[in-house]
Amino acid sequence: QLAEQYPPHPYSFSYDATDETGARISTSESGDESNSKTGSYSYQTPDGVYRTVNYVADATGFHASIDTNEPGTKSEAPADVTINANPIEVKEAYAFKAKSAA
């Protein structure tokens, strides 16, 4: 037996939070009566590295655009995704062992 089908109903939601390290994450999405979805999600680290993904999901498929400054990224457009990269330079971090007390 098939479950009863209901037509799509418009909706929207969002949240924005900052964790104990200072990293920020957020998302939002809305859907309409034609079952199309539009939304975004993002994060930003305390040192300024960020990524934002904006998307549309509809009868033609899932289409995303990504804005980022993550190290090692480059601007390109594979498949149906556009990546707008502006990578930042990362300074290497070094760890030193403490000398033991003699």
Curated annotation (Swiss-Prot):
Sequence ranges of Polar residues compositional bias: 36-45
Chaperone is among the record's keywords: no
Region (Disordered): 1-45
GO CC annotation: chitin-based extracellular matrix
Keywords: Chitin-binding, Cuticle, Pyrrolidone carboxylic acid
Domain Chitin-binding type R&R: 8-74
InterPro entries associated with the record: CHIT_BIND_RR_consensus (IPR031311), Chitinase_insertion_sf (IPR029070), Cuticle_Struct_Prot (IPR050468), Insect_cuticle (IPR000618)
Superkingdom of origin: Eukaryota
Pyrrolidone carboxylic acid modifications at: Q1
GO molecular function ontology, one term from the record: chitin binding
Keyword Iron-sulfur: no
Function: Component of the cuticle of the tick. Binds chitin.
This protein's name: Cuticle protein 10.9
